[in-house]
Structure formats: C-alpha cells, structure tokens
C-alpha cells in the first residue's frame, strides 16, 4: 500500500479497493493476500471470531496463513430519495437503511454507520408511517395507474436470466471500481438494448426483478458517465481529480413516461438519488 497512499493499510476504503484492483490487473491474479499472522492466534480468535471460523471452513487458518482478498460491491450510497423521516415523494412509501438516500453519506460511506443508519431512520420511518395511518390520506389507486400485462409473445425466462447474469458482469467490468468515459458509454449503450428487450419479459419475479436491475444499472452508469470527475468511491481514470464547484451537487434519476435520466439538479425538480 505504500505505493498508493501515505496511510498505507489505514487509507480510505475506496483507495484500498482500487489499489487491490490495480495489483490484480498488474499481476493477472484473482486476489491479493492479507497477512495478519503477526497479530497472534489468541488475539485473532478473540477479536475476529467470525472471520477466523469462516476462513477455517475453507481450510485457511488465518493465524498461520495469508487471507486471499478481492474487492466486491459492499455498500450502495445512493437510493430512494427520502426526507429525515424516511418518506419518499410517493405518498405512503417509506425507505430506510441502505435502500434509501437519506443524506447521511456523501461520496463515501461513513465507517461503521450502516447499523446506526438503519436503527435511526427505521425508527423515524415507523413513527412517521404510524402517524400517517391515523392522520393522513392516501391517493385513490385506480387500476389505470398500474402497468397492464402486455399482449404478445413473452421472452423465455432463461433469456431473462442471461440478461441478468450479463448485467452483473457488465456492471463489474465497465462500471466498477475504476471507470472511464469509454467503458461507461459502452455500458449505457448495452443496458439500453437490454431495457428494450425486457419490454417483453414475463410478469413473474425473475422478469420484474431483472427489469428493476437494468433500470438501476442504467441510472448508475449514466450518472457516472455524466460526472466527469473523481470523488470518493466514484473514480474516473480519465478524470482522476476532483475539480470545480459545479460538481458539488447530487444527481437524480427519475422515471417518467418514457423513463429518462436528468443529469444534475435542474430547476423545479427534487433530488432523488446520488451518483
């Protein structure tokens, strides 16, 4: 880590993740190694019992052997835009925890804040929802407000699964730890093609979930393409530095008919997600 940050192993998590990724790319390896053997068996077993037992199930004794390490998706810092009570702009819909964009995170997640965020906003959302049940009113949900099951030939479920698996690989390779304008544009173009194909997806759980995954992937890729700078976990290899006050804003993705992406914050709109 001395080649990547002056704090070495104590560097911010996004820098550590990119450092691991770059070493894996340089060496063509599937992982790097973490050596904690110097801490001693007693300390490791008492301080990290879950890690110790998990690695032991894979025949890795962390008191004597190095731990293979690879980056992965850990936390989503965007989400459904809510107020401080977990309320979204859809009456009666509340969100709390990692699914929500409540404003407590910036371009990086605050360390050890996940459980506290769920606890605080889960409690506030429950209070607000309870109050709404007794004092609020809900819109009349007419049948025409819901998507109708389209006619015609449906896409086979196995084709939906292929798109889902391909989307996962695309998001990791093109919209992952290190991004470029070229990789992001390719991702946006491919996701748009999948989005069109999925209009014929079956109205079952795999079909609906894959549609949602493609939609979220499109928002992430488009927001990352628009944000031509690097900040926190969003790292553009072609724009490695954070420059300009114009980037000190959130970006939102709002579904309309048809769905479209709005880069940045425009007049008379609400912020609904973070890039």
Q: Which residue stretches match the model-derived regions?
A:
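Long, amphipathic alpha-helical stalk/connector segments used for oligomerization, subunit docking
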Residues: 131-203
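A glycine-rich phosphate-binding loop feature that marks nucleotide/adenosyl-phosphate handling sites
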Residues: 69-76, 137-152, 234-244
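A conserved FAD-binding loop/helix module that cradles the flavin
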Residues: 90, 102-129
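Flexible, glycine/charged-enriched surface loops at secondary-structure junctions
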Residues: 31, 62-70, 134-143, 200-207, ...
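Short beta-alpha connecting loops at secondary-structure transitions
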Residues: 5-6, 104-115, 146-153, 172-176
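A glycine-rich dinucleotide-binding beta-alpha-beta segment and adjacent secondary-structure elements
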Residues: 47-100, 206-228, 234
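C-terminal amphipathic alpha-helical interaction region
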Residues: 205-275
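An anion/pyrophosphate-binding glycine-rich loop and adjacent beta-alpha core
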Residues: 1-67, 119, 128-134
């Amino acid at each position: 880590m001395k080649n990547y940050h002056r704090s070495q192993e104590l560097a911010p998590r996004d820098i550590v993740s990119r450092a691991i990724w770059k070493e894996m790319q340089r060496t063509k390896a599937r992982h790097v190694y973490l050596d904690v053997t110097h801490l001693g068996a007693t300390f490791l077993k008492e301080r990290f019992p879950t890690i110790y037992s998990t690695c032991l199930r894979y025949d890795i004794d962390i008191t004597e052997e190095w731990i293979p390490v690879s980056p992965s998706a850990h936390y989503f810092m965007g989400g459904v835009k809510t107020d401080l009570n977990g309320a979204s702009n859809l009456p009666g819909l509340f969100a709390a925890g990692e699914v929500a964009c409540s404003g407590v995170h910036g371009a990086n997640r605050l360390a050890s804040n996940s459980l506290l965020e769920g606890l605080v906003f889960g409690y506030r959302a429950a209070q607000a929802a309870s109050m709404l049940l007794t004092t609020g009113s809900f819109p009349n949900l007419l049948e025409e407000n819901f998507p109708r099951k389209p006619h015609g030939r449906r896409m086979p479920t196995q084709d939906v699964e292929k798109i889902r698996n391909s989307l996962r690989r695309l998001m990791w390779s093109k919209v992952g730890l290190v991004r470029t304008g070229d990789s992001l544009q390719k991702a946006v173009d491919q996701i748009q093609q999948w989005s069109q194909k999925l209009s014929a997806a079956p109205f079952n759980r795999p079909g609906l979930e894959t549609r949602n995954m493609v939609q979220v992937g499109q928002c992430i890729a488009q927001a990352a393409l628009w944000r031509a700078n690097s900040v926190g976990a969003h790292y553009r290899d072609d724009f490695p530095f954070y420059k300009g006050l114009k980037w000190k804003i959130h970006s939102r993705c709002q579904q309309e008919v048809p769905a479209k992406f709005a880069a940045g914050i425009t007049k008379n709109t609400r912020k609904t997600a973070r890039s």
